[in-house]
C-alpha cells in the first residue's frame, strides 16, 4: 500500500510540474507565456520559411517578438540550440509596401510594439544575428537562406 501511494504521489508531482510549462506544446516545441516556439535548422528563404511554419501547425508563423522579455527568451533558445556561427535566424518581421509608404509588419499580423533594429531599412526581411547573441535585428535580402524559428499561440 505504501509503495502504491508513493508511486501515485510521484506521478502527481510530475503531472503538476508539467502543466503550465511546455506541456501544452508539441513535444519538440518550447513554451513561453501563451506561445510555443520551434527552431528549424534548415536553410530557407524568408518566404519559404514562413510557408514551412504555416504548414507545421495551424496558426504558426515565423517568430514575432513583442517584448524585451520575449526577445531574451528567443535569444536564449537560439544561443543554446544553434551552435554554428555561419547562419543567422529569420524572424517574422518584414517591410511591406503600401502605396507610397512602407511599414514593418509581423507575418502573424501582430503589431510591432517592440523593436531592436540595427541597420536602416534598405532590404525587406529581418534576421537575428548570431554575432549579437541573437539579440539584434538586421535588415537583409529576403532571398538569402537562413535558419528560422516558428511560433504559434498555444491551445487552451
Swiss-Prot record:
Changing residue 91 to T: In subunit alpha-3. InterPro entries: C-type_lectin-like, C-type_lectin-like/link_sf, C-type_lectin/snaclec_domain, C-type_lectin_CS, CTDL_fold. Residues 32-151 form the C-type lectin domain. SMART domains: CLECT. Disulfide bonds join 25-36, 53-150, 125-142. Interferes with one step of hemostasis (modulation of platelet aggregation, or coagulation cascade, for example). Heteromultimer; disulfide-linked. This is Snaclec stejaggregin-B subunit alpha. It comes from Trimeresurus stejnegeri (Chinese green tree viper).
